[in-house]
Amino acid sequence: MSYGSGRFIDVREGPNVRFGYDGARIMARAGPLRVDAFAVRPQLTKPNAFDDIADVHQGFWGSWATLDLSALTADLYYLGVERDEFRYQKVDGKEWRHTVGARARAKLAVADVELEGAYQFGNVGASPISAWTIAGESVFRRAKLPLEPTMTLGFGATSGDRGPSSGTLGTFNPLFPRGAYFGLVSANGPENEVSPHAALALALAEGLSFSVEAWSFWRQSTSDGIYSVPGRLLRRGTPADARYLGTQVEAFLSWQIDRHVSLSGTLAYFAAGAFFDTSAPGKDIAYGAAWASYKF
């Protein structure tokens, strides 16, 4: 399953094998309106063919409505997740988390503009949840210029926990998002973060494209740590630790040879920020990869 921009539900193409679910989904369509409802369990990926099994320790359900017009796409959704055990910096235990949100993407004269916001509630153990996320992106396309440049400017923020004195758990959880959330490195996930980014894409020749993208990361709350893309705690944080996490730059080259075959390569660098000097020693990350894809 994949919905919207993949901030909550995606197949995780890229750094991982495709992410699947076992369960049921109902889809209804009336003109430009589509409504899906589902109740599933995430799959546990096994090494052999046709041996994946459902994760009985997690349940996932919800409904996603999309209105698709010529110049506007709007989403409204509710998502629920139940996990037998999940760990955050402040608390761990059985999790019941509910997400309500909306997303809109409009094609304007100067750019394509997207806005999304969501609120989360529920509980982990005895701690009630109160978390949020906001994101926005503008895409400027100039097809009549040489190399057909496309520039993207974006911003995202997700809540972190406010510390032991707060009466709620404020750590946002992205549920089952795209794997390459911040490129193929994705050294940190979209929890407790503020992350502006910019990108430039160029069409070098027929089927040959190049892009470069940069992100900077800060902790939204200095009382919370940093997490992986699926929401696992990577490193604890305190107000004594710096807010700045680092900056990442990634370049991507792709050649679509024909409708079936493509070749791709990427180089990326994550420069660790002051947080990794104050919390514990951290190192920069250099990453490179090349691959070929065949699609039937």
Walk through the language-model features, giving the residues of each.
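Flexible, solvent-exposed coil segments and beta strand-coil junctions
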Residues: M1-F8, F38-T45, G80-D84, E114-Q120, ...
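Signature for the C-terminal beta-barrel architecture of outer-membrane proteins
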Residues: R7-S165, A203, S223, P239-A240, ...
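Active-site proximal loops enriched in glycine and acidic residues that flank catalytic Cys/His/Asp
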Residues: Y78, G117-Y119, F155-A157, V212-S216, ...
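C-terminal structural cap/anchor segments
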Residues: P149-T150, F155-Q248
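Conserved C-terminal beta-signal and adjacent last beta-strands/turns
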Residues: A198, S211-V212, L245-Q256, V261-T266, ...
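C-terminal beta-signal and adjacent terminal beta-strands/loops
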Residues: Q256-K283
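Outer-membrane beta-barrel "beta-signal"
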Residues: G282-F296
